[in-house]
Amino acid sequence: MATRAVARRQSATGETADSASSVRAHGGEIADRDLVGMYLDEIARTPLLDAAKEVELSQTIEAGVFAQQVLDGEEESRTDATREELQALVDAGERAKDVFIRSNLRLVVAVARRYPRSGLPLLDLIQEGNAGLVRAVEKFDYRKGFKFSTYATWWIRQAITRSIADQSRTIRLPVHLVEELGRIRRVQREFNREHGRDPEPAEVAAELGSTPERVIDVLDWARDPVSLNMAVDDAGETQFGDLLEDTSAVSPEQSVLTLLRSEELDDLIGRLDQRTASIIKMRYGIDDGRERTLTEVGKEHGLTRERIRQIEKHALLELKKLARDTGFDAAA
């Protein structure tokens, strides 16, 4: 339909957004802000509507919708109009809808710019907002006397916040939490501008009529997850997950070494090959009481920490098997 063509042609989902995607895909020669400027220049060519024009276009759209329903057999015909005349009304309604949408695309940009820290590019927010604008035009009832911009802002904002909730986070937050988080961050920014410091949770809560506990909870829920594979040292050898204790799991030391009676431990380790035995003794400080890290053991043996970890894992499994075969008492 013509209206859908407008949303594709004149919104960020259309030619301008397609161009933006193409530019980014081919090296990003033009910054997003330049593309937004190009888009604004394009949509600024369509004049804004006054209230009378909004009513006129709404009436034309309504007539076109009714005519389409008659043509489709969904509405009982109460008119002597021919199919050609009904089709003319449908076409006029689509043109009116196109004009209505084009004339309000700047409103979408204004709303989208309220979400600078959403995690999504501005052009993507505009794209989602344009879908909300189309919905607003379709649902607008001029008889209720509402100003269209006020009515449409709600639909645009809803489309944008839902997109943020669905796309911008690894873990999806409910829409109402995304909106609450937005209000909290807006208060934080305004407070920082006025006072030159970040507000305490109690100060944010007082501004929003909430509680400090609620503010803290929302901010905690909104934290981005951290990858367990993230490197935490300059060499990239130690990962964040290596530093976290798994309190629900039995450690290798508990599962193997404490299983064995100390007087028989040397005998079991002696059954391993010389290099593996040396690695196990260094890792758990069996000879001198000082445990070494994977990196330290690796340097001593000229191996990477990952290779040491693999050897250690295999050796512990072998020690378990040897312990079972020799009938060691697990309670020792």
Curated annotation (Swiss-Prot):
DNA-binding region range list: 294-313
A UniProt-annotated Pfam family: Sigma70_r1_2
GO terms, biological process: DNA-templated transcription initiation
Biased composition (Polar residues): 10-22
Keywords: DNA-binding, Sigma factor, Transcription, Transcription regulation
One term of GO molecular function: sigma factor activity
Function: Sigma factors are initiation factors that promote the attachment of RNA polymerase to specific initiation sites and are then released.
Protein name: RNA polymerase principal sigma factor HrdD
Taxonomic path: Bacteria, Bacillati, Actinomycetota, Actinomycetes, Kitasatosporales
